[in-house]
Amino acid sequence: MAAGRLRILFLLLLSLHLGLGWVLDLQEAPAADELSSGKMAETGRTWKPHQGNNNVRLPRALPGLCRLWSLTLPVAELGLGYASEEKIIFRYCAGSCPQEVRTQHSLVLARLRGQGRAHGRPCCQPTSYADVTFLDDHHHWQQLPQLSAAACGCGG
């Protein structure tokens, strides 16, 4: 436990020293497996870029491209009717999709959009899913198949 806290403190100090301006957020952030320690997900702690206004000039960030994000939620907040005090990590996809995706489908779709015959833009969506398992209030294991996104990509 102390080693985990020390690692978090080290990462925080290093990021501030490098001018990255990252802070710890307990609600919404990029998936924890993007960090060096996968144990962040177990505690519900994830990282996201600092958005406050302090005197540190932040480096210009890349546009928010399609990627995996995570939220730590109580099972009851899923709205699926399960009674449980457990918290789960719900992963989802969000971000923008570049127009340069080069598949036959995307090339034809881009041409049709240019002619006004097709609508919409490529969207960020899960390319694979993961099952989520939790213990309900009656001490029974519940498995929710394909509840959480496992990988993201641009489609459409």
Curated annotation (Swiss-Prot):
Tissue and organ distribution: Expressed at low levels in substantia nigra. Cochlea.
GO BP terms: branching involved in ureteric bud morphogenesis; glial cell-derived neurotrophic factor receptor signaling pathway; peripheral nervous system development
A Gene Ontology molecular function term of the record: receptor tyrosine kinase binding
InterPro entries: Cystine-knot_cytokine, GDNF_fam, TGF-b_C
Compartment(s) where it occurs, according to its Swiss-Prot or TrEMBL record: Secreted
CDD domains xrefs: TGF_beta_Persephin
Cellular component terms (Gene Ontology): extracellular space
Assembly: Homodimer; disulfide-linked. Interacts with GFRA4 coreceptor and RET: forms a 2:2:2 ternary complex composed of PSPN ligand, GFRA4 and RET receptor.
Family assignment from sequence similarity: Belongs to the TGF-beta family. GDNF subfamily.
Protein name, UniProt field: Persephin
